[in-house]
């Protein structure tokens, strides 16, 4: 990660304190919007890949990052976030799969030190989303904590046919 002190993605300016992430109804397509509704970043899953891959572009269609699965058909595994402009791995996203709770650990790609953790809130909601027909329509709620376990943000799902999250 050269001499960078942060885990920023070159070409992406995140200046608001909240964003909305919305998934397309049909495919694994996502867009993140700022408070004014402007698209900051968007991406879609590449089809027919053995390893899941999500390239992301900014509002001007410039490539900014890629998220790629570490393994084939990775239900509980890791994903690498790579800066498209520098080619550097930025962070590793570890998914600890459980029917009771969704947990993502975010680690520095170089040192492997834990940077943050994202945990779903409410085991019953997580079970319903995974088991009940149409359970995917139930909104998720997540808590984001830093490496010391302090709350630094939240992700609140909104009831919708497609996943829609407010990140604060």
What are these regions (language model features)?
Residues 1-168:
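Intrinsically disordered, low-complexity proline/glycine-rich segments
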